[in-house]
């Protein structure tokens, strides 16, 4: 058998770990020396089955973390939660007969299966052991014995296969057993279940570079490091040039608007020395309404200058107390347990001083952990639950608390989490068709794809990312957890990470947003294609509800709101999207992010920095679109002075010399076919003029001089419109309302581009570049158009 060597990366909490894997041996890197939230590692391959062997009685001491430099990988039991023995095969038609191990193991544990009972929200349910939980999972997926036909299918399985259009005689034994395990309904409470089909649609939208969702191009030459990020480091105490990434403004907890704090705007940011295990939070400030990126200043590390990698502070949110102090909500991370990331939601009161030039941190008090066990165990996975089955691949999350206050003055935290026993991770989730969301044909095809790919199967077994919500009680400076609720969003079987949630109220609706990397999902085909075509797989997802604590539905049908536009190692790559309300608007949001992935992936000295912000519009029908409005870097408050063209780019200007080489250094992807896109223009939600059905003359003109004109009957809502087709290959598609009169506004479309390395530079046709060539061409076009109107009787 040929030995193959490839580099793989996996994410442990917010830490990326690089490993070289062969068919027999893995060499790891100590977790204490790697960094959080490293995005150029987008190629994450689930090494669940390859990294280590799960013992039948796994304990809380993770030997995988302890011995990852010397672990011998054995091709025996999978490391998914139910210790499945499903073998990897290249074809679904291959007959597999070794499921006896699963059935035997399940039968042994059937009598020990534990019944999961709901616990009180204030009392973490950690009493149920993982052995019992595992036994329950295995019992749930045991193949039923009441097969009824010659193919070994149950009545339900036969119906599913028939609806899917499958030739029953072609089914393998493995596929028959899988179909017999399928559940069509689930009693588990999930909030909105992010389905496999939704994930698929999100990836396809990213690949298509739909301009409604594709992040605008930025001018790479205009991007600079943040001056305020050259500051005293929290760990070393020395002045250093720091990366700045996840950031959040001090906001009104009810409206979400950036607070004017004594004439200043305040922002809390994660910062650290590149290529160092240095993850702490700092307070940044600028005059309120000042759009100059260079005017931002640094008040320093919020928790002082004796910080260590053992105790870190990750993302959160902040608001202002009645006495003017800040109430900070953040993630306190303890890495002392074999370098694992024990994440807990925490809060602290930050007392500030100021004058007309500066803001100072005077003291920090009331620093307390709100969730000492991590999750409560029932709604959300606790640290102990995760630790007892962790073998080096499963992601744990209890982080990024976002504070929001309702009309009654009650405060809630929305946060990233992992599902608890209410809807736990496990192999049985693969056979739960409520997780798929498609037709029988789609669901069965996807199920069989899992059977074909051990990596995907394992990812699906572990995946249990969620967006959670809890209610606070008590004094606002020293709050306590009052109640945990069922997740607002769950993604069992689909994704293992949904980051940085925030909720914004627009009008009478609540909008939930979260950032994610698709490579933390189980659909390897989808995110690998995104990497191949675009070079990155980051997205922002959005959901809407009439209530804060439940009822969320995906925006744009799938949940997609923003998609990556450029490769992960370009200077203008972005992530960690955070939506900020625009004062006085009920349908626009300012989208903020950091730019340039951490640890100098875009080149030496090109640190992570704040990106230019841009607008999106939220429409009444539950759709959104990116608008052609952009700011300078680090603008958190949109007003008329925010608008600039300095940072606006095209695909030609979105990269620095040497970046557009068709290669991303994660060792698996080479080449990508980027597509141009143009953000939309702002449109009021209430039309200013009535919609009429008029005679429209449409015509297409190509640059080689061909003209095609034909009158058609369409619905038109303005004096004229220009349609740009991504597939037009340089043609103009113009529709003109004859009755309205006026001038024709003609804009060349974006030309299609070649996917090869030599020609994948943007063929972005700008008015400037084509103006000289276009003036005489468009004059001739107008003359032809006028003659045509007269010839058919229009005046």
From Swiss-Prot:
Gene assigned in the entry: ftf
Composition bias, Polar residues: 42-66, 112-130
GO MF annotations, alphabetized: levansucrase activity; metal ion binding
Catalytic activity of the protein: [6)-beta-D-fructofuranosyl-(2->](n) alpha-D-glucopyranoside + sucrose = [6)-beta-D-fructofuranosyl-(2->](n+1) alpha-D-glucopyranoside + D-glucose
Site keyed Transition state stabilizer: positions: 400
Disordered: annotated span: 42-83, 103-138
Chain ranges passing through the membrane: 774-794
Protein's UniProt name: Levansucrase
Function as written in the Swiss-Prot or TrEMBL entry: Catalyzes the synthesis of levan, a fructose polymer, by transferring the fructosyl moiety from sucrose to a growing acceptor molecule. Also displays sucrose hydrolase activity.
GO biological process, one term: carbohydrate utilization
Positions bound to sucrose: 245-246, 315, 399-400, 497, 517
Family named by the database record: Belongs to the glycosyl hydrolase 68 family.
Chief location bin: membrane
Signal sequence residues: 1-36
GO cellular component, one term: cell surface
Species the sequence originates in: Streptococcus mutans serotype c (strain ATCC 700610 / UA159)
Enzyme class: transferase
Record comment: activity regulation: Ca(2+) may play an important structural role and promote stability of levansucrase.
Pfam families xrefs: Glyco_hydro_68, KxYKxGKxW_sig
Residues of the active site: 246, 499
Subcellular location as annotated: Cell membrane; Cell surface
Membrane topology: Single-pass membrane protein
Sites where the protein binds Ca(2+): 394, 425, 464, 496
């Amino acid at each position: 058998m040929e030995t193959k060597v490839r580099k793989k990366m996996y994410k442990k909490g917010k830490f990326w770990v690089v490993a070289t894997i062969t068919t027999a041996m893995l060499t790891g890197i100590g977790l204490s020396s790697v960094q959080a939230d490293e995005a150029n590692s987008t190629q994450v391959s689930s090494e669940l089955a390859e990294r280590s062997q799960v013992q039948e009685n796994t304990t809380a001491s993770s030997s995988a973390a302890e011995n990852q430099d010397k672990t011998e990988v054995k091709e025996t039991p999978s490391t998914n939660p139910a210790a499945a023995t499903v073998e990897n095969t290249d074809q679904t038609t291959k007959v597999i007969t070794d499921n006896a191990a699963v059935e035997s193991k399940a039968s042994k544990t059937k009598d020990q299966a534990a019944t999961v009972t709901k616990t009180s929200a204030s009392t973490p349910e950690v009493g149920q052991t993982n052995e019992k939980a595992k036994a329950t999972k295995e019992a749930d997926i045991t193949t039923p014995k009441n097969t009824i036909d010659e193919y070994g299918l149950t009545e339900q399985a036969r119906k599913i296969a028939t609806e899917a259009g499958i030739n029953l005689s072609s089914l393998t034994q493995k596929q028959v057993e899988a179909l017999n395990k399928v559940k069509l309904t689930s009693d588990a409470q999930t909030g909105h279940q992010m389905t496999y089909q939704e994930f698929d649609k999100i990836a396809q939208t990213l690949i298509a570079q739909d301009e409604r969702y594709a992040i605008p191009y930025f001018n790479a030459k205009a991007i600079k490091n943040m001056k305020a990020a050259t500051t005293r480091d929290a760990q070393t105490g020395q002045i250093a040039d720091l990366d700045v990434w996840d950031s959040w403004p001090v906001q009104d907890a009810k409206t979400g608007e950036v607070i004017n704090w004594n004439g200043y705007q305040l922002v809390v940011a994660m910062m650290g020395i590149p290529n160092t295990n240095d993850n702490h939070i700092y307070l940044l400030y600028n005059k309120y309404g000042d759009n100059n990126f260079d005017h931002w200043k640094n008040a320093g590390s919020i928790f002082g200058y004796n910080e260590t990698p053992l105790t870190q502070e990750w993302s959160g949110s902040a608001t202002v107390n009645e006495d003017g102090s800040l109430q900070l909500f953040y993630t306190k991370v303890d890495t002392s347990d074999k370098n694992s990331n024990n994440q807990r939601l925490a809060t602290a009161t930050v007392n500030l001083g100021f004058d007309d030039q500066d803001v100072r941190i005077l003291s920090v008090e009331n620093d307390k952990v709100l969730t000492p066990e991590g999750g409560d165990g029932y709604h959300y996975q606790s640290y102990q639950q995760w630790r007892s089955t962790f073998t080096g691949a499963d992601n744990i999350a209890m982080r990024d608390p976002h504070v929001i206050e309702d009309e009654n003055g009650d405060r809630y935290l929305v946060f990233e989490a992992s599902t608890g026993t209410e809807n736990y991770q496990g192999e049985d989730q693969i056979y739960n068709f409520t997780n798929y969301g498609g037709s029988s044909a789609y669901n069965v095809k996807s199920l069989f794809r899992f059977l074909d790919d051990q990596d995907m199967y394992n990812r699906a077994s572990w995946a249990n990312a969620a967006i959670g919500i809890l209610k606070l009680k008590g004094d606002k400076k020293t709050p306590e957890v009052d109640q945990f609720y069922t997740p607002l969003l769950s993604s069992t079987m689909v994704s293992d990470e949904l980051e940085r949630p925030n909720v914004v109220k627009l009008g009478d609706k609540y909008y939930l947003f979260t950032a994610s990397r698709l490579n933390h999902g189980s659909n390897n085909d989808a995110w690998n294609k995104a990497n191949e075509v675009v070079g990155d797989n980051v997205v922002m997802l959005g959901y809407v509800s009439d209530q804060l604590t439940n009822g969320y539905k995906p925006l744009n049908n799938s949940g997609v709101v923003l998609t990556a536009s450029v490769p992960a190692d370009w200077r203008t790559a972005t992530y960690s999207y955070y939506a900020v309300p625009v004062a006085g608007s009920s349908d626009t949001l300012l989208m903020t992010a950091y730019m340039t992935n951490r640890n100098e992936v875009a080149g030496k000295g090109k640190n992570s920095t704040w990106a230019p912000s841009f607008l999106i519009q939220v429409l009444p029908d539950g759709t959104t679109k990116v608008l052609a409005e952009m700011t300078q870097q680090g603008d958190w408050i949109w007003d008329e002075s925010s608008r600039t063209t300095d940072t606006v780019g095209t695909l030609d200007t979105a990269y620095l010399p040497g970046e557009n080489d068709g290669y991303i250094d994660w060792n698996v992807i080479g080449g990508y076919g980027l597509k141009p896109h143009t953000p939309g223009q702002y449109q009021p939600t209430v039309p200013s003029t009535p919609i009429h059905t008029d005679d429209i003359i449409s015509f297409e003109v190509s640059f080689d001089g061909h003209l095609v004109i034909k009158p058609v009957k369409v619905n038109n809502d303005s004096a004229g419109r220009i349609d740009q087709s991504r597939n037009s290959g340089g043609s103009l598609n113009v529709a003109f309302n004859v009755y309205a009169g006026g001038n024709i506004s003609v804009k060349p479309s974006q030309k299609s581009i070649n996917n090869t390395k030599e020609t994948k530079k943007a063929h972005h046709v700008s008015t400037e570049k084509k103006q000289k060539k276009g003036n005489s061409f468009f004059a001739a076009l107008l003359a032809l158009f006028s003659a045509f109107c007269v010839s058919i009787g229009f005046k």
